[in-house]
Amino acid sequence: MRATVLGAGSWGTALASLLAGKGYTVTSWDKDAAVLDDIARNHRNERYLPGLQLPPTLHASGEVAKALEGAELVVLAVPSHAVRPVVIEAKRHVHAGTPIVCVAKGIELDTLMTMTEVIEDVLPVPLHPYLAVLSGPSFAKEVAKGLPTAVTVAARWERIAKQVQDAFHTKTFRPYTSGDVVGCEIGGCVKNVVAIAAGISDGMGFGANAMAALVTRGLAEITRLAVRKGANPLTLSGLAGLGDLVLTCSSDLSRNRTVGRGLAAGKTADAIQRELGQVAEGVRNARSARELAKRLGVEMPITEAIYRVLYEGLAPREAVTALMMRETKPEL
Protein backbone atom coordinates (compact mmCIF):
# COMPACT_ATOMS: atom_id res chain seq x y z
CA MET A 1 0.00 0.00 0.00
CA ARG A 2 1.05 3.57 -0.71
CA ALA A 3 0.04 6.11 1.92
CA THR A 4 0.47 9.86 2.17
CA VAL A 5 0.50 11.79 5.44
CA LEU A 6 -0.15 15.52 5.05
CA GLY A 7 1.55 17.13 8.03
CA ALA A 8 4.89 16.13 9.54
CA GLY A 9 4.37 17.32 13.08
CA SER A 10 4.57 14.92 16.01
CA TRP A 11 1.24 13.16 15.34
CA GLY A 12 1.63 13.02 11.58
CA THR A 13 5.15 11.63 11.91
CA ALA A 14 4.10 9.06 14.50
CA LEU A 15 1.32 7.77 12.24
CA ALA A 16 3.57 7.84 9.17
CA SER A 17 6.15 5.83 11.10
CA LEU A 18 3.50 3.33 12.18
CA LEU A 19 2.30 2.80 8.60
CA ALA A 20 5.83 2.59 7.24
CA GLY A 21 6.67 0.08 9.96
CA LYS A 22 3.98 -2.18 8.51
CA GLY A 23 5.85 -2.19 5.23
CA TYR A 24 3.74 0.43 3.46
CA THR A 25 5.43 2.98 1.23
CA VAL A 26 4.67 6.26 2.99
CA THR A 27 5.31 9.85 1.95
CA SER A 28 5.17 12.72 4.45
CA TRP A 29 4.32 16.19 3.19
CA ASP A 30 4.79 19.43 5.08
CA LYS A 31 5.53 23.10 4.47
CA ASP A 32 8.57 22.96 6.77
CA ALA A 33 11.49 22.17 4.46
CA ALA A 34 13.89 21.57 7.34
CA VAL A 35 11.65 18.88 8.84
CA LEU A 36 11.24 17.18 5.47
CA ASP A 37 14.98 17.29 4.86
CA ASP A 38 15.60 15.63 8.23
CA ILE A 39 13.11 12.88 7.38
CA ALA A 40 14.53 12.33 3.89
CA ARG A 41 18.23 12.46 4.74
CA ASN A 42 18.40 11.10 8.27
CA HIS A 43 15.12 9.20 8.74
CA ARG A 44 14.50 11.37 11.80
CA ASN A 45 12.27 14.26 12.86
CA GLU A 46 14.30 15.89 15.60
CA ARG A 47 12.04 18.93 15.83
CA TYR A 48 8.86 17.06 16.71
CA LEU A 49 9.93 13.54 17.75
CA PRO A 50 13.55 13.78 18.87
CA GLY A 51 15.43 10.52 19.19
CA LEU A 52 13.06 8.45 17.05
CA GLN A 53 14.56 6.50 14.15
CA LEU A 54 12.05 6.44 11.29
CA PRO A 55 11.60 3.45 8.94
CA PRO A 56 13.45 3.55 5.60
CA THR A 57 10.13 3.21 3.73
CA LEU A 58 9.09 6.66 5.00
CA HIS A 59 9.85 9.32 2.39
CA ALA A 60 9.30 13.09 2.31
CA SER A 61 8.14 15.62 -0.26
CA GLY A 62 7.32 19.32 -0.16
CA GLU A 63 5.14 19.06 -3.27
CA VAL A 64 1.52 18.09 -2.64
CA ALA A 65 1.02 16.59 -6.10
CA LYS A 66 4.14 14.45 -5.83
CA ALA A 67 3.35 13.38 -2.27
CA LEU A 68 -0.15 12.25 -3.24
CA GLU A 69 0.84 10.45 -6.44
CA GLY A 70 -0.50 6.90 -6.31
CA ALA A 71 -1.76 7.26 -2.73
CA GLU A 72 -4.18 4.54 -1.63
CA LEU A 73 -4.62 6.12 1.81
CA VAL A 74 -4.41 9.81 2.78
CA VAL A 75 -3.95 10.99 6.37
CA LEU A 76 -4.64 14.64 7.15
CA ALA A 77 -2.50 15.53 10.16
CA VAL A 78 -2.13 19.30 10.03
CA PRO A 79 -3.32 21.69 12.78
CA SER A 80 -7.05 22.38 12.64
CA HIS A 81 -6.66 25.94 11.33
CA ALA A 82 -4.63 24.60 8.37
CA VAL A 83 -7.12 21.93 7.29
CA ARG A 84 -9.05 24.08 4.81
CA PRO A 85 -6.05 25.55 2.93
CA VAL A 86 -4.27 22.19 2.79
CA VAL A 87 -7.36 20.39 1.46
CA ILE A 88 -7.86 23.15 -1.11
CA GLU A 89 -4.30 22.54 -2.28
CA ALA A 90 -4.65 18.76 -2.27
CA LYS A 91 -8.14 18.22 -3.67
CA ARG A 92 -7.12 17.95 -7.33
CA HIS A 93 -4.78 15.10 -6.47
CA VAL A 94 -7.15 12.91 -4.41
CA HIS A 95 -9.43 10.46 -6.17
CA ALA A 96 -12.70 8.74 -5.31
CA GLY A 97 -12.12 5.43 -3.59
CA THR A 98 -9.14 6.68 -1.57
CA PRO A 99 -9.86 6.82 2.17
CA ILE A 100 -9.06 10.23 3.69
CA VAL A 101 -8.37 9.99 7.42
CA CYS A 102 -8.58 13.22 9.39
CA VAL A 103 -6.68 13.27 12.68
CA ALA A 104 -6.90 17.05 13.19
CA LYS A 105 -9.02 18.04 16.19
CA GLY A 106 -10.87 21.33 16.09
CA ILE A 107 -13.80 23.51 15.11
CA GLU A 108 -13.16 26.11 12.40
CA LEU A 109 -13.63 29.54 13.94
CA ASP A 110 -15.14 31.41 11.00
CA THR A 111 -17.70 28.74 10.06
CA LEU A 112 -18.00 26.69 13.29
CA MET A 113 -17.65 23.55 11.17
CA THR A 114 -16.04 20.37 12.43
CA MET A 115 -13.02 19.17 10.49
CA THR A 116 -14.94 16.69 8.33
CA GLU A 117 -17.51 19.40 7.58
CA VAL A 118 -14.66 21.65 6.45
CA ILE A 119 -13.24 18.89 4.27
CA GLU A 120 -16.65 18.19 2.74
CA ASP A 121 -17.05 21.92 2.10
CA VAL A 122 -13.92 21.80 -0.07
CA LEU A 123 -13.90 18.34 -1.67
CA PRO A 124 -16.21 17.25 -4.50
CA VAL A 125 -19.28 15.33 -3.31
CA PRO A 126 -18.11 11.96 -4.74
CA LEU A 127 -15.20 12.01 -2.26
CA HIS A 128 -17.34 12.61 0.85
CA PRO A 129 -18.14 8.94 1.59
CA TYR A 130 -14.44 8.14 1.87
CA LEU A 131 -13.81 10.42 4.85
CA ALA A 132 -12.89 8.95 8.23
CA VAL A 133 -11.79 10.30 11.60
CA LEU A 134 -9.15 8.72 13.83
CA SER A 135 -9.36 9.87 17.44
CA GLY A 136 -8.78 8.68 20.98
CA PRO A 137 -6.23 8.65 23.81
CA SER A 138 -3.02 8.62 21.83
CA PHE A 139 0.02 10.76 22.50
CA ALA A 140 2.27 10.83 19.46
CA LYS A 141 5.40 10.13 21.47
CA GLU A 142 3.99 6.90 22.91
CA VAL A 143 2.63 5.70 19.56
CA ALA A 144 6.02 6.39 17.97
CA LYS A 145 7.71 4.32 20.68
CA GLY A 146 5.37 1.40 20.00
CA LEU A 147 3.59 1.58 23.35
CA PRO A 148 0.12 -0.04 23.45
CA THR A 149 -2.59 2.34 22.25
CA ALA A 150 -6.29 2.05 21.38
CA VAL A 151 -8.25 4.55 19.29
CA THR A 152 -11.53 4.94 17.43
CA VAL A 153 -11.91 5.14 13.65
CA ALA A 154 -15.24 6.66 12.66
CA ALA A 155 -16.70 6.84 9.16
CA ARG A 156 -20.18 7.06 7.68
CA TRP A 157 -19.45 4.02 5.52
CA GLU A 158 -18.67 0.94 7.59
CA ARG A 159 -16.50 -0.35 4.75
CA ILE A 160 -14.26 2.71 4.95
CA ALA A 161 -13.99 2.50 8.75
CA LYS A 162 -12.97 -1.15 8.43
CA GLN A 163 -10.47 -0.37 5.68
CA VAL A 164 -8.81 2.32 7.82
CA GLN A 165 -8.91 0.06 10.88
CA ASP A 166 -7.06 -2.66 8.99
CA ALA A 167 -4.51 -0.19 7.63
CA PHE A 168 -3.52 1.06 11.09
CA HIS A 169 -3.90 -2.11 13.17
CA THR A 170 -0.65 -3.45 14.62
CA LYS A 171 0.32 -5.44 17.71
CA THR A 172 0.64 -2.13 19.61
CA PHE A 173 -2.03 0.03 17.92
CA ARG A 174 -5.63 -1.15 18.12
CA PRO A 175 -8.38 0.83 16.33
CA TYR A 176 -12.08 0.22 17.01
CA THR A 177 -14.67 1.25 14.41
CA SER A 178 -17.64 3.57 14.83
CA GLY A 179 -20.26 5.20 12.64
CA ASP A 180 -20.45 8.30 14.84
CA VAL A 181 -18.19 10.79 13.11
CA VAL A 182 -19.51 13.91 14.83
CA GLY A 183 -19.31 12.35 18.30
CA CYS A 184 -15.66 11.47 17.78
CA GLU A 185 -14.91 14.92 16.43
CA ILE A 186 -16.57 16.89 19.22
CA GLY A 187 -14.99 14.65 21.85
CA GLY A 188 -11.55 15.08 20.34
CA CYS A 189 -11.89 18.83 20.01
CA VAL A 190 -13.47 20.01 23.25
CA LYS A 191 -11.44 17.75 25.53
CA ASN A 192 -8.51 20.04 24.75
CA VAL A 193 -10.37 22.95 26.33
CA VAL A 194 -11.15 20.93 29.45
CA ALA A 195 -7.49 19.89 29.59
CA ILE A 196 -6.50 23.55 29.90
CA ALA A 197 -8.85 23.77 32.87
CA ALA A 198 -7.25 20.63 34.30
CA GLY A 199 -3.82 22.21 33.98
CA ILE A 200 -5.02 25.32 35.79
CA SER A 201 -6.48 23.19 38.58
CA ASP A 202 -3.28 21.21 38.93
CA GLY A 203 -1.08 24.30 38.73
CA MET A 204 -3.04 26.00 41.49
CA GLY A 205 -2.84 22.94 43.72
CA PHE A 206 -6.57 22.31 43.90
CA GLY A 207 -6.13 18.59 44.47
CA ALA A 208 -7.62 15.31 43.31
CA ASN A 209 -11.23 16.11 44.25
CA ALA A 210 -11.26 19.11 41.94
CA MET A 211 -9.65 17.15 39.12
CA ALA A 212 -12.23 14.36 39.33
CA ALA A 213 -15.07 16.89 39.33
CA LEU A 214 -13.55 18.74 36.40
CA VAL A 215 -13.18 15.64 34.25
CA THR A 216 -16.72 14.48 35.07
CA ARG A 217 -18.42 17.82 34.48
CA GLY A 218 -16.21 18.45 31.47
CA LEU A 219 -17.43 15.21 29.93
CA ALA A 220 -21.01 16.26 30.66
CA GLU A 221 -20.71 19.47 28.67
CA ILE A 222 -18.80 17.80 25.84
CA THR A 223 -21.62 15.25 25.62
CA ARG A 224 -24.30 17.96 25.59
CA LEU A 225 -22.66 19.68 22.64
CA ALA A 226 -22.03 16.45 20.76
CA VAL A 227 -25.61 15.23 21.21
CA ARG A 228 -26.95 18.58 20.02
CA LYS A 229 -24.85 18.05 16.88
CA GLY A 230 -26.43 14.62 16.40
CA ALA A 231 -23.95 12.33 18.16
CA ASN A 232 -24.71 9.14 20.06
CA PRO A 233 -24.06 9.90 23.76
CA LEU A 234 -22.48 6.46 24.19
CA THR A 235 -19.65 7.54 21.89
CA LEU A 236 -18.55 10.04 24.52
CA SER A 237 -18.14 7.27 27.10
CA GLY A 238 -15.67 5.53 24.79
CA LEU A 239 -12.12 6.07 23.61
CA ALA A 240 -12.86 9.20 21.58
CA GLY A 241 -14.65 10.80 24.52
CA LEU A 242 -13.83 9.76 28.07
CA GLY A 243 -10.62 8.00 27.09
CA ASP A 244 -9.15 11.00 25.30
CA LEU A 245 -10.36 13.37 28.02
CA VAL A 246 -8.79 11.41 30.88
CA LEU A 247 -5.47 11.12 29.06
CA THR A 248 -5.26 14.78 28.10
CA CYS A 249 -6.27 16.02 31.54
CA SER A 250 -3.90 13.80 33.50
CA SER A 251 -0.59 13.54 31.65
CA ASP A 252 2.38 15.88 31.53
CA LEU A 253 2.70 15.00 27.83
CA SER A 254 -0.48 17.03 27.18
CA ARG A 255 0.28 20.38 25.57
CA ASN A 256 -3.12 21.72 26.57
CA ARG A 257 -2.65 20.73 30.20
CA THR A 258 0.75 22.42 30.05
CA VAL A 259 -0.94 25.61 28.84
CA GLY A 260 -3.26 25.47 31.85
CA ARG A 261 -0.37 25.05 34.26
CA GLY A 262 1.35 28.01 32.66
CA LEU A 263 -1.77 30.14 32.96
CA ALA A 264 -1.95 29.25 36.65
CA ALA A 265 1.64 30.51 36.97
CA GLY A 266 0.71 33.85 35.41
CA LYS A 267 2.04 33.28 31.89
CA THR A 268 0.13 34.16 28.72
CA ALA A 269 -1.07 31.50 26.30
CA ASP A 270 1.10 32.95 23.53
CA ALA A 271 4.22 32.77 25.69
CA ILE A 272 3.47 29.20 26.74
CA GLN A 273 2.96 28.04 23.16
CA ARG A 274 6.21 29.70 22.09
CA GLU A 275 7.97 27.71 24.80
CA LEU A 276 6.26 24.51 23.63
CA GLY A 277 7.19 25.11 20.00
CA GLN A 278 3.95 23.37 18.97
CA VAL A 279 0.25 24.18 18.71
CA ALA A 280 -2.00 23.61 21.71
CA GLU A 281 -5.35 23.19 19.96
CA GLY A 282 -7.38 23.99 23.08
CA VAL A 283 -6.40 27.66 22.94
CA ARG A 284 -8.05 28.14 19.56
CA ASN A 285 -10.81 25.61 20.26
CA ALA A 286 -11.93 27.44 23.41
CA ARG A 287 -13.15 30.28 21.21
CA SER A 288 -14.74 28.17 18.47
CA ALA A 289 -16.36 25.68 20.87
CA ARG A 290 -17.81 28.56 22.90
CA GLU A 291 -19.26 30.15 19.75
CA LEU A 292 -20.72 26.83 18.57
CA ALA A 293 -22.29 26.25 21.99
CA LYS A 294 -23.86 29.72 21.90
CA ARG A 295 -25.21 29.11 18.40
CA LEU A 296 -26.76 25.79 19.44
CA GLY A 297 -27.97 26.96 22.85
CA VAL A 298 -25.80 24.50 24.80
CA GLU A 299 -24.61 25.37 28.31
CA MET A 300 -20.83 24.85 28.63
CA PRO A 301 -19.63 26.60 31.79
CA ILE A 302 -16.10 25.16 31.83
CA THR A 303 -15.53 26.10 28.21
CA GLU A 304 -16.92 29.57 28.92
CA ALA A 305 -14.59 29.98 31.90
CA ILE A 306 -11.51 28.97 29.90
CA TYR A 307 -12.52 31.33 27.10
CA ARG A 308 -12.70 34.20 29.58
CA VAL A 309 -9.30 33.34 31.05
CA LEU A 310 -7.69 33.15 27.60
CA TYR A 311 -9.40 36.05 25.86
CA GLU A 312 -10.87 38.38 28.48
CA GLY A 313 -8.13 38.40 31.09
CA LEU A 314 -10.12 36.68 33.84
CA ALA A 315 -7.81 35.47 36.59
CA PRO A 316 -7.77 31.65 36.85
CA ARG A 317 -8.70 31.73 40.54
CA GLU A 318 -11.67 33.98 39.81
CA ALA A 319 -12.76 31.60 37.05
CA VAL A 320 -12.79 28.71 39.52
CA THR A 321 -14.79 30.73 42.04
CA ALA A 322 -17.31 31.68 39.35
CA LEU A 323 -17.75 28.02 38.41
CA MET A 324 -18.22 26.92 42.02
CA MET A 325 -20.71 29.71 42.79
CA ARG A 326 -23.01 29.05 39.86
CA GLU A 327 -26.67 28.44 40.68
CA THR A 328 -27.15 25.00 42.23
CA LYS A 329 -29.00 22.36 40.19
CA PRO A 330 -29.57 18.59 39.82
CA GLU A 331 -26.64 16.61 38.43
CA LEU A 332 -28.60 14.88 35.66
From Swiss-Prot:
> Which InterPro entries is this protein grouped with?
6-PGluconate_DH-like_C_sf, 6PGD_dom2, G3P_DH_NAD-dep, G3P_DH_NAD-dep_C, G3P_DH_NAD-dep_N, NAD(P)-bd_dom_sf
Pfam families tied to this protein: NAD_Gly3P_dh_C, NAD_Gly3P_dh_N
- UniProt subcellular location: Cytoplasm
Q: Which GO terms describe its biological process?
A: carbohydrate metabolic process; glycerol-3-phosphate biosynthetic process; glycerol-3-phosphate catabolic process; glycerophospholipid metabolic process; phospholipid biosynthetic process
Active-site residues per Swiss-Prot or TrEMBL entry? 191
Q: Which UniProt keywords apply?
A: Cytoplasm, Lipid biosynthesis, Lipid metabolism, NAD, NADP, Nucleotide-binding, Oxidoreductase, Phospholipid biosynthesis, Phospholipid metabolism
**According to its record, what are the GO cellular component terms?**
cytosol
GO MF, one term, reads: NAD binding
- Record-annotated residues binding sn-glycerol 3-phosphate? 105, 136, 138, 191, 244, 254-256
Q: Which residues bind NADPH?
A: 10-11, 31, 105, 140, 255, 279, 281
Q: In which pathway does it act?
A: Membrane lipid metabolism; glycerophospholipid metabolism
For this UniProt entry, what is the primary localization, expressed as one broad class?
Answer: cytoplasm
EC code(s) of this entry = 1.1.1.94
Enumerate the catalysed reactions.
Answer: sn-glycerol 3-phosphate + NAD(+) = dihydroxyacetone phosphate + NADH + H(+); sn-glycerol 3-phosphate + NADP(+) = dihydroxyacetone phosphate + NADPH + H(+)
Function in brief: Catalyzes the reduction of the glycolytic intermediate dihydroxyacetone phosphate (DHAP) to sn-glycerol 3-phosphate (G3P), the key precursor for phospholipid synthesis.
Which HAMAP family does this entry report, sorted A to Z? NAD_Glyc3P_dehydrog
Concerning its family, UniProt says: Belongs to the NAD-dependent glycerol-3-phosphate dehydrogenase family.
Its protein name is Glycerol-3-phosphate dehydrogenase [NAD(P)+]
Q: What is the lineage of its organism?
A: Bacteria, Pseudomonadati, Myxococcota, Myxococcia, Myxococcales
Identify the gene encoding this protein: gpsA
